[in-house]
Design a protein with these regions (language model features):
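Amphipathic alpha-helical assembly/interaction segments
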Residues: 1-107
Length: 107
């Protein structure tokens, strides 16, 4: 798994989902926060493989925390009716896989 590219793809999917949420009549009030966390995840994992091992672990944990934050906002959007399970499923699956890869490599 190329964590840098996967994190970038995750950030893009989060941005697309936020755009969708903003286009709906009932706008999800935490969409901006979800977008910020998605971008943080992508930026923290950028060029991860080029870093020294200690820095790599620290940045991987930072990126994993941002992924967790996105998944939390995503769950809030689903439970409050702004998204369906189906609408959230792709980003949720991507986030879970990315989080696992980041945490495994950070340990």
């Amino acid at each position: 798994m190329d964590r840098s590219n996967d994190a970038f793809d995750f950030a893009i999917r989060v941005a697309e989902l936020v755009r969708y949420l903003r286009e709906k009549p009932d706008r999800f009030p935490l969409a901006a926060e979800m977008l910020a966390a998605g971008v943080r995840a992508g930026m923290a994992a950028r060029d991860l493989e080029d870093l020294a091992e200690t820095a790599q672990a620290s940045r991987a944990r930072e990126a994993a925390a941002a992924v967790d934050e996105v998944l939390y906002y995503l769950e809030m959007a689903v439970r409050s009716g702004y998204l369906t399970e189906l609408e959230a499923s792709h980003v949720r699956t991507m986030g879970a896989a990315l989080h696992a890869a980041l945490i495994d490599d950070a340990e």
